[in-house]
């Protein structure tokens, strides 16, 4: 199963405007290859409840960061909060809270299959109160998972997918925690 990070509103409009999903992002590529997906029908099918307070972006219906919608071999993640112009922004604390909810949701939906997640927060999402490298984000994701009590059960595994980057090394995992 692959985790696909959306914004808190599960936006499906792909384009270049600030509020759009960028075509080159993982989410944009997913939407490009699943053009007929009906996110609202999926939300309704699992009974996912929206937050009482709407998004900062136009008051749109939004969902708690970390909540998942299962779809075939994918886990669609409500990830980043939107600001008033539609940019993805969250604080470090909101990022950690999202991870805590994410682990619970994965535990609910993974069905003893391996799960792959990207380095969340390393795309165009902006952390409001701190600037973190991909290395630091990876360390936070790993540390958060280690603290979560109910791990994915063998033979299934959790994979964190990352691209080669000058700002990243598997040899440096754990240096920033």
Language-model features: where?
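Macrodomain-like recognition of ADP-ribose-binding/processing modules
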Residues: 1-177
């Amino acid at each position: 199963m692959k985790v696909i990070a959306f914004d808190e509103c599960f936006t499906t409009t792909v384009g270049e405007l600030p509020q759009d999903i960028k075509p080159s992002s993982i989410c944009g590529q997913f939407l490009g290859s699943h053009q007929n997906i009906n996110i609202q029908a999926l939300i309704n099918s699992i009974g996912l409840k929206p937050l009482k307070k709407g998004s900062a972006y136009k008051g749109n219906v939004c969902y708690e960061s970390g909540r998942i919608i299962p779809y075939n071999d994918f886990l669609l993640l409500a990830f980043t909060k939107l600001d008033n112009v539609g940019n993805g922004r969250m604080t470090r604390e909101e990022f950690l809270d999202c991870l805590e909810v994410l682990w619970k949701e994965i535990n609910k939906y993974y069905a003893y299959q391996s799960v792959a997640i990207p380095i969340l927060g390393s795309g165009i999402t902006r952390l409001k109160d701190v600037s973190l490298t991909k290395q630091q984000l990876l360390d936070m994701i790993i540390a958060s998972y280690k603290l979560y009590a109910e791990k994915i059960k063998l033979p299934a595994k959790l994979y964190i997918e990352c691209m080669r980057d000058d700002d990243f090394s598997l040899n440096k995992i754990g240096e920033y925690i």
